[in-house]
């Protein structure tokens, strides 16, 4: 027997007494004079119902294959005695490596709750002759590539986390008699192929059974399966296709979430319940299919809807399009196309009235998107991180889109947005962090660039329509890339404070009065050092608060051709002696002369037609002569 074992380097206990009863302190390695040459052991039975003691196989450093009558100490042991590593013991030896095996997924995450065993580094294959596989049995067995069961094995149960962390597993066939598989059974394992087809008593795939298994490529499911629970294949990123049996009625939330290689799915006729995000972030999935006899779901252009189209259950992340929207859909819901990075476009019909928040988030493949004419509401973040340097956003002729809300185009990375003529009302920060060039329609009647409208805008240039008369406070503030700003200064009657502050254009200007297209916008540098100023001859508008607080200014010469003086333009110029208002000035804003005592001289043939509210509020001069 020993000579035969030495010759074959395997120990076969099939025909020898007391395969592995209690051996006292004598391990198998000691029995055969050391375990550094035995590569295979087959244990077919333990006589008299005795157990395999803890550490019975300690020291078997050359072991590559092992056949056991059951997993653990006895056929029915659970707890530590039901773990595969138990028979190798908790003492290290040459050629062993440490594993941490627990009884649940929580133990896997918290190794301090696990049991420590030392198993041979080269152990690759284990054959189980009989019995169930209890919770955590093969947890963290990182060298095993194969675990097989005898054809006549009475195996009905594979426990929770049974193969969790067994990262080298190649293939696994579930024994025909198995009816229950526990949660997390193959979570974090490396099993590539799984065959469950013979286990026709399995009706439930539990939570996380294959969760975060990044090597699982193919699987055959049992034909009587009814439920695929939530997170069952969560982030199984190598899974390419799966055939879901006709018997399945329920697929839980996040069941196939982030199965990034999944290319095709055909849903069965009996499916009644589909959980939230069941197929979200399946980046290779271009379209969904469902049996046409299914009464609860329907597909339209590759998207899975409820049969009445009131809910969209799956928008495949790999969808290309352009995608047509069903007539029954009147709103593109929040997050609808989120992370559809291959989406080229969407075809709107006339019944669509709104685009929800994050509806096109991260749709980086958009080419040309023409928004339907009846869309009146675009929610915040609708296009966050959408588009690319070639993307164009258009609005259909006759568009009714009038009100642009805050962050409607936040983080849009498109080439350009061509706004419709109807878009005349804007919130502040409507284009915050937007990289697209914003183009106004030639027929727009927009009059006001509201406060903060382009604050933090990331575009490089902008041309305001000729209809604009007012630029609000901080309108372009912190638009760090903005180097070209075009508008008709002759039409501007009011510019708010810090309107262009910290733009690329502004930051390139020298100290002194900053003039843009005839707009004297701001004094850059120290204001209180100015004593005498003569405006450039082409100045047509003074921005709000332009000279506010220039306390040492004594002489100010305004140019002929100046048209408008914005609010608080001369406020607090306490030492200014005289101010001559050119006859070309037609408009003076609110509190323009607050807290100043200079003599103000108006031309008798002047063109003044507008005085703002409280234009002379706080004026301390003695005489005013305002032309009729």
Where are these regions (language model features)?
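Short, well-ordered amphipathic alpha-helices
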Residues: 84-96
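Consensus positions within tandem repeat domains that build extended binding/scaffold surfaces
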Residues: 55-56, 86, 135-137, 159-162, ...
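Structural signature of tandem-repeat unit edges
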Residues: 6-25, 29-51, 61-77, 96-132, ...
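Short, flexible/disordered intra-domain loops and linkers
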Residues: 74-87
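A structural signal for leucine-rich repeat
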Residues: 55-59, 79-82
């Amino acid at each position: 027997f020993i000579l035969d074992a030495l010759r074959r380097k395997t120990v076969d206990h099939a025909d020898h007494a007391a395969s592995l009863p209690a051996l006292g302190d004598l391990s198998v390695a000691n029995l055969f004079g050391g375990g550094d040459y035995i590569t295979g052991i087959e244990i077919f039975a333990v006589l008299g119902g005795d157990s395999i003691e803890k550490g019975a196989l300690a020291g078997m450093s050359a072991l590559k294959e092992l056949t056991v009558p059951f997993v653990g100490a006895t056929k029915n042991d659970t707890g530590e005695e039901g773990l595969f590593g138990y028979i190798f013991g908790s003492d290290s030896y040459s050629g062993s490596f440490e594993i941490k095996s627990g009884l649940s997924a929580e133990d896997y995450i918290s190794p301090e709750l696990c049991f420590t065993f030392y198993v041979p580094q080269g152990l690759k294959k284990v054959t189980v002759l009989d019995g169930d596989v209890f919770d955590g049995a093969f947890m963290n067995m990182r060298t095993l590539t194969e675990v097989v069961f005898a054809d006549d094995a009475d195996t009905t149960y594979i426990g929770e986390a049974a193969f969790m962390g067994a990262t080298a597993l190649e293939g696994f066939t579930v024994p025909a008699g198995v009816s229950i598989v526990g949660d997390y059974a193959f979570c974090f394992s490396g099993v590539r192929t799984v065959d469950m087809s013979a286990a026709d008593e399995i009706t439930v795939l539990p939570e996380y059974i294959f969760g975060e298994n990044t090597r699982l490529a193919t699987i055959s499911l049992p034909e009587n399966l009814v439920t695929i629970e939530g997170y069952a294949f969560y982030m199984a990123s190598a899974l390419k296709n799966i055939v879901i049996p006709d018997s399945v009625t329920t697929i839980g939330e996040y069941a196939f979430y982030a199965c990034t290689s999944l290319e095709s799915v055909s849903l069965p006729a009996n499916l009644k319940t589909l959980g939230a995000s069941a197929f979200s972030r399946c980046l290779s999935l271009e379209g969904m299919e469902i049996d046409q006899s299914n009464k609860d779901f329907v597909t339209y252009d590759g998207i899975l809807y409820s049969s009445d189209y009131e809910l969209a259950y799956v928008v495949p992340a790999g969808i290309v399009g352009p995608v047509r929207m069903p007539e029954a859909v009147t709103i593109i819901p929040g997050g609808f196309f989120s992370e559809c990075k291959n989406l080229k476009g969407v075809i709107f019909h006339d019944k669509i009235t709104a685009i929800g928040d994050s509806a096109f988030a991260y749709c980086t493949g958009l080419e040309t998107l023409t928004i339907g004419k009846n869309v009146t509401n675009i929610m915040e973040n609708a296009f966050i991180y959408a588009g690319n340097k070639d993307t164009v956003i258009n609005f259909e002729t006759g568009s009714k889109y009038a009100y642009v809300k805050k962050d409607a185009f936040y983080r849009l990375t498109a080439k350009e947005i061509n706004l419709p003529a109807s878009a005349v009302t804007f919130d502040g920060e409507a284009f915050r962090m937007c990289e697209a060039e914003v183009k106004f329609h030639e027929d727009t009647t927009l009059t006001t660039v509201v406060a903060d409208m382009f604050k933090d805008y990331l575009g490089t240039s902008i041309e305001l329509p000729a209809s604009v008369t007012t630029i609000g406070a901080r309108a372009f503030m912190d638009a760090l890339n903005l180097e070209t700003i075009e508008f008709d200064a002759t039409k501007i009657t009011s510019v708010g404070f810090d309107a262009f502050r910290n733009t690329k254009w502004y930051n390139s200007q020298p100290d002194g009065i900053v003039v843009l297209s005839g707009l004297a916008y701001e004094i850059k540098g120290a204001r209180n050092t100015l004593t005498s100023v003569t405006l450039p001859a082409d100045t047509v508008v003074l921005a709000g608060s332009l000279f506010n607080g220039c306390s040492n200014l004594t002489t100010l010469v305004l140019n002929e051709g100046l048209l408008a003086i914005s609010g608080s333009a001369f406020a607090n110029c306490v030492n200014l002696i005289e101010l001559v208002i050119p006859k070309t000035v037609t408009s003076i804003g609110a509190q323009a002369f607050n807290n100043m005592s200079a003599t103000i001289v108006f031309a008798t043939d002047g063109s003044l037609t507008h005085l703002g509210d409280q234009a002379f509020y706080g004026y301390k001069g003695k005489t005013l002569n305002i032309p009729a």
